[in-house]
C-alpha cells in the first residue's frame, strides 16, 4: 500500500514536470578576442555549507552528487564524494537594456522536495521585475551528469513580458577540488568553449591530481561541460574581471564571448534563453577528457528530462521500499525517508562503506580554494572524509531502517581500509582509508565503536575479521583505556563519560566475539576490563564538590579525579573554566548503550543540571550546547559563527569560524535527539516527541539536519560581495547556523529517534550490555593485586614473570602490549592458586609495555581487574 502510494506520487511529479511551459529567444552575443583577459582572476573560495538539498542517483555507476545552497547549485562532487567541482551554477536574467539580476544577489527563494527528498525544486522570485525561476535538480542515473530543468514564469499580478527576458547560466568553478585565482593561483582551472558538436559548450577542467593530500592516490583529471537544450552563445573568463560574464552583463546587459581562459579562477557564462516558450534544461556533464564531458552532457540532454527524473526517483522509491517503516509514525514519513536517503547518498560509489560525515564542508565559503600547503594545492576534504565515530552513528541509522548491507559495508570499511597496524582507528581518513592532511590524534571511542558495529551487524563470526581486526582493536583498548587521546568533541584529553561508555560497549562486544571463537582468555580479559570501567565510571567523572549540585557528571576529568580544582581552556577562543563547572550531555551514552539505568540518581541529577545550564529555548524548540557552564552567560563554546555577547573572544558577529579558528558555538540539534532518547528511556514519550520536532524545525532547506542551529537574535546577511572571511551569511533564531548541513550524525539521530518512537524504546541500545549491566544489575568485583613487575621497571629479557594475588581459583588473563613497537599484544592465562596467588611468564616487547591483569570467577558473575604499566 505504502509502495503504491509513493509510486503514484512520483508519477504525479512526472506529470507536473511534463506540463511545464517552454521559454524565448535571446540576442546573439557579441564576439571579441578568443583569449580572455584578466588572468588569473579573483581568489576562489569553496562553497556555502548550509545546504538546501542534496542528491545523487542510487545507481553506483553514476558517480556524481549535487547540492543546492542559497537557492542555487552548489558543491557538485565527481567522480568521488570528496572531489568538489562547483562553487555555484546560477542564473543571470536581463532584459537587455535596463536591469541584470543574479539569483543569489537579487532574488529570494523557496525550496521543496519530492517524497524521497532526493529531487529538489527551487522557486527563485524576482519581485522587483515580476518573474520566477522554477528549477528542479536531479542527477542522471545513467551517467555523471547533473540536470537542472527550469521554467520561467511571471509572478502573480505581474505584467512582465517574459519573452523580453534573456536567461544566462553562470558557472563558477573549482574543478578537481581547487579553483586558482588570486596571488597563489594554486590548482588553477582552464576554460574553453567547445564547438565540436556545432553549438558552443563551455568546458572547465583541471588535469592536476597532486595536492598536499599525498595519500589521495585516486584523483583523476576532471573535465566539466555545461550544455543546455537552448545554447546560443558561451564564454569563459576570469572571475571578477572584465572577462567574467556577470561583470559584462551588469555593465552592458550583453555578453562578450571569449573561447579560452587558461590557468586561473574560471567562470563560464552561457546564453540559455529558450528559442521558444519558457523552459530550458541544463546538463553539467563530467568526464576524463574534454570530448567525454561534452558527450556525457549531450547524451543526458538527448533524453526528455521527465523520463530521466522518473528513473531517478524510481531508484530512490525502490530503495525506500526495502527499508523498515516505523510503526505508527506516518506523519513523519517524509523526515524518516529523507534521513535514510541522505545517509545512503553520503556513501562514496568507488569505495563502498565510505560514508562521509557530511555532504558539506563547514564554512566553505570562507575557505580559499586557490592556495598552497607544503608547496602543493591545498586539499579541502573536511567533513567529506570518513570519521569512525560519525560512521558508527550513521551505522545506527542504517541498522534502524533495515539497511544491514550498507551497515556491514561501513563496518568492513573501517576494519579493512582504515584501521592502523596498532589496532586503533585514526581520527579520520580519506575515502581509501589512508591518512588525510587533517588526520590527528587517537580517540578511543573511535576504536571501540567498530567492534560494537561488527557484533551488532552479525560480522563477529568472521574468523579473519576477528583475528586480524577485532582482536587487535580490543587489545588496544585494554592497553590504552580508559583515558587516552581526546573525547568526542576532539578538543580535550581526560576521562570522558561518553568515551568510556563506548569502550565498555566495545569491549563487551569483543568479549562475546572472543568467546564465540573459543578464545576464553581474551573473552575474560575484555569483559573484566569493561566491567572495571563500568564500575569506576562515576569515580572518574562524577563530581561531589561542584557548584551545580551534590553529585553529577561533568564533561570530563583531566586526571581521573572529578573533585580536583583543575581549570582548562575550552579552546577556540573560549574561556578557561574549572572542570567541575563544565557540563556536557555525554553521560547519556551510559544510558543509551545499556550501562547505567536512566533511573540512576546521578543520571537523573545530571539531566536536570544539563537542562538548566546548557539548554536554550528557541522558536524551533529546545536545543543544547556541546558543553558549557551557564547558557545564561552565553555560549562558552568557540566553534561556530561569531556572536556577541558570549563567553568567547570573537569580535565580528556573523563571521565564520575558519579564518581565525575562533567564534561562538551554537546549539547542536543532534543533542536534542540525544536528550530525547533519555526521555524515551524514562517513558516520557511526549518529551521525546517535542525534542524530535525541535530537530525537524532546526533543519535547513527540505529537512536537512544541521550541525548547529542559531539561538541568538536574527542577524542579516552581509551585502553581496563582502569579504568572505568576515561576512555573515544571515541567521534566524532557531534555524540552521553556518557550519554544515546536513550532518550525517544528526540525520542518523533523527532517523533512529523516529524509529525508536515507533518501537516504544531506543532501538540502538545493545542487548548485550543491557543484559549484563541493567537486567540483573552490574556484576560484582574481585580484588586483584599485581606484585611484580613493578610499574616503571626496566626489563632485560623477552619475557617477564607477572605475579600477584586475587580470589582463589580465579581465571587470570594477562595482556602485554608494547606501545612503542606496535607489535601485536599477547594474552597469557593462568589460574590463581588456593591461596589466591598467581604467577605466569609473559612475553614482552622491547619498548614500553602495558601489562593488564584481570581475574574472573566462573559462574559467580563476579569479575575484577588490575592494571600495571
Residue ranges and their predicted role:
Residues 179, 201-236, 326-327, 331-335, ...:
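Extended ligand-binding clefts on enzyme/binding-domain cores
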Residues 33-125, 204-244, 315-325, 329:
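An extended acidic
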Residues 31-40, 129-132, 140-149, 153-382, ...:
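Acidic/polar, glycine-enriched structural segments that form the non-catalytic walls/loops
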Amino acid at each position: 500500500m505504502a509502495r503504491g502510494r509513493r509510486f503514484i506520487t512520483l508519477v504525479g511529479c512526472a506529470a507536473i514536470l511534463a506540463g511545464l511551459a517552454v521559454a524565448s529567444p535571446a540576442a546573439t552575443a557579441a564576439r571579441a578576442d578568443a583569449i580572455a583577459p584578466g588572468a588569473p582572476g579573483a581568489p576562489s573560495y569553496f562553497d556555502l555549507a548550509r545546504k538546501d538539498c542534496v542528491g545523487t542517483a542510487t545507481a553506483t555507476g553514476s558517480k556524481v552528487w549535487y547540492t543546492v545552497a542559497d537557492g542555487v547549485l552548489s558543491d557538485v562532487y565527481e567522480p568521488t564524494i570528496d572531489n568538489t567541482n562547483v562553487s555555484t551554477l546560477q542564473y543571470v536574467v536581463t532584459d537587455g537594456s535596463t536591469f541584470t539580476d543574479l539569483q543569489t544577489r537579487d532574488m529570494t527563494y523557496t525550496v521543496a522536495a519530492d517524497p524521497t527528498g532526493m529531487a529538489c525544486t527551487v522557486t527563485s522570485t524576482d519581485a522587483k521585475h515580476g518573474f520566477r525561476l522554477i528549477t528542479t535538480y536531479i542527477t542522471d542515473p545513467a551517467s555523471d551528469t547533473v540536470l537542472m530543468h527550469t521554467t520561467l514564469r511571471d509572478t502573480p499580478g505581474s505584467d512582465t513580458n517574459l519573452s523580453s527576458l534573456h536567461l544566462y547560466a553562470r558557472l563558477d568553478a573549482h574543478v578537481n577540488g581547487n579553483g586558482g585565482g588570486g596571488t597563489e593561483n594554486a590548482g588553477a582551472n582552464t576554460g574553453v568553449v567547445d564547438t565540436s558538436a556545432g553549438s558552443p559548450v563551455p568546458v572547465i577542467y583541471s588535469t592536476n591530481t597532486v595536492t598536499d593530500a599525498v595519500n589521495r592516490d585516486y584523483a583523476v583529471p576532471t573535465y566539466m561541460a555545461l550544455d543546455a537544450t537552448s545554447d546560443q552563445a558561451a564564454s569563459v573568463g576570469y572571475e571578477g574581471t572584465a572577462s567574467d560574464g556577470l561583470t559584462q552583463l551588469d555593465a552592458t546587459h550583453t555578453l562578450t564571448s571569449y573561447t579560452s581562459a587558461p590557468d586561473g579562477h574560471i567562470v563560464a557564462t552561457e546564453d540559455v534563453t529558450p528559442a521558444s516558450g519558457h523552459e530550458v534544461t541544463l546538463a553539467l556533464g563530467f568526464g576524463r577528457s574534454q570530448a567525454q564531458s561534452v558527450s556525457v552532457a549531450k547524451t543526458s540532454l538527448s533524453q526528455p528530462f521527465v523520463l530521466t527524473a522518473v528513473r531517478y526517483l524510481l531508484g530512490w522509491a525502490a530503495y525506500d521500499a526495502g527499508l523498515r517503516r516505523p510503526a505508527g509514525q506516518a506523519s513523519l514519513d517524509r523526515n524518516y525517508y529523507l534521513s535514510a536517503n541522505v545517509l545512503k547518498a553520503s556513501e562514496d560509489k568507488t569505495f563502498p562503506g565510505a560514508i562521509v560525515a557530511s555532504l558539506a564542508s563547514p564554512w566553505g565559503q570562507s575557505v580559499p580554494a586557490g592556495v598552497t600547503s607544503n608547496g602543493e594545492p591545498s586539499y579541502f576534504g573536511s567533513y567529506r572524509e570518513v570519521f569512525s565515530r560519525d560512521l558508527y552513528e550513521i551505522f545506527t541509522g542504517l541498522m534502524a531502517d533495515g539497511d544491514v548491507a550498507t551497515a556491514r559495508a561501513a563496518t568492513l570499511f573501517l576494519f579493512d581500509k582504515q584501521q592502523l597496524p596498532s589496532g586503533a582507528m585514526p581520527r579520520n581518513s580519506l575515502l581509501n582509508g589512508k591518512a588525510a592532511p587533517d588526520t590527528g590524534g587517537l580517540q578511543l571511542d573511535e576504536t571501540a565503536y567498530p567492534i560494537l558495529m561488527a557484533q551488532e551487524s552479525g560480522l563477529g563470526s568472521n574468523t579473519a575479521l576477528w583475528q586480524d581486526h577485532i582482536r587487535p582493536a580490543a587489545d588496544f583498548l585494554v592497553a590504552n583505556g580508559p583515558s587516552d587521546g581526546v573525547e568526542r568533541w576532539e578538543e580535550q584529553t581526560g576521562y570522558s563519560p561518553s568515551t568510556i561508555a563506548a569502550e565498555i560497549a566495545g569491549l563487551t562486544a569483543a568479549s562475546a566475539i572472543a568467546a564465540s571463537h573459543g578464545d576464553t582468555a581474551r573473552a575474560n580479559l575484555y569483559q573484566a576490563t569493561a566491567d572495571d570501567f563500568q564500575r569506576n565510571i562515576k569515580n572518574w567523572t562524577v563530581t561531589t564538590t561542584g557548584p551545580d549540585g551534590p553529585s553529577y557528571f561533568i564533561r570530563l576529568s583531566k586526571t581521573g579525579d572529578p573533585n580536583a580544582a583543575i581549570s582548562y581552556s575550552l579552546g577556540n577562543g573560549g574561556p578557561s573554566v574549572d572542570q567541575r563547572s563544565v557540563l556536557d550531555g555525554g553521560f547519556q551514552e551510559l544510558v543509551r548503550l545499556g550501562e547505567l539505568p536512566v533511573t540512576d540518581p546521578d543520571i537523573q541529577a545530571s539531566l536536570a543540571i544539563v537542562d538548566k545550564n546548557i539548554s536554550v529555548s528557541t522558536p524551533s524548540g529546545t536545543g543544547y550546547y556541546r558543553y558549557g557552564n551557564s547558557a545564561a552567560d552565553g555560549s562558552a563554546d568557540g566553534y561556530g559563527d561569531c556572536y556577541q555577547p558570549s563567553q568567547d573572544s570573537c569580535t565580528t558577529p556573523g563571521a565564520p569560524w575558519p579564518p581565525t579558528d575562533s567564534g561562538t558555538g551554537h546549539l547542536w540539534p543532534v543533542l536534542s535527539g540525544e536528550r530525547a532518547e533519555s526521555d524515551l528511556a524514562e517513558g516520557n514519550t511526549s518529551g521525546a516527541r517535542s525534542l524530535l520536532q525541535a530537530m525537524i524545525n532546526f533543519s535547513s532547506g527540505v529537512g536537512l539536519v544541521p550541525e548547529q542551529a542559531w539561538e541568538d537574535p536574527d542577524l542579516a546577511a552581509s551585502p553581496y560581495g563582502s569579504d568572505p572571511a568576515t561576512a555573515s551569511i544571515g541567521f534566524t533564531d532557531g534555524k540552521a547556523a553556518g557550519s554544515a548541513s546536513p550532518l550525517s550524525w544528526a540525520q542518523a539521530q533523527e532517523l533512529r529517534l523516529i524509529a525508536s518512537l515507533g518501537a516504544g524504546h531506543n532501538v540502538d541500545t545493545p542487548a548485550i550490555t543491557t543484559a549484563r549491566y541493567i537486567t540483573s544489575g552490574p556484576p560484582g568485583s574481585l580484588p586483584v593485586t599485581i606484585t611484580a613487575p613493578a610499574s616503571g621497571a626496566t626489563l632485560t629479557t623477552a619475557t617477564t614473570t607477572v605475579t600477584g594475588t586475587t580470589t582463589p581459583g580465579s581465571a587470570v588473563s594477562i595482556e602485554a602490549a608494547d606501545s612503542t613497537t606496535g607489535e601485536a599484544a599477547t594474552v597469557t592465562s593462568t589460574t590463581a592458586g588456593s591461596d589466591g596467588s598467581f604467577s605466569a611468564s609473559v612475553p614482552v616487547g622491547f619498548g614500553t609495555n602495558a601489562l593488564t591483569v584481570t581475574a574472573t570467577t566462573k559462574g559467580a558473575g563476579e569479575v575484577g581487574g588490575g592494571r600495571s604499566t
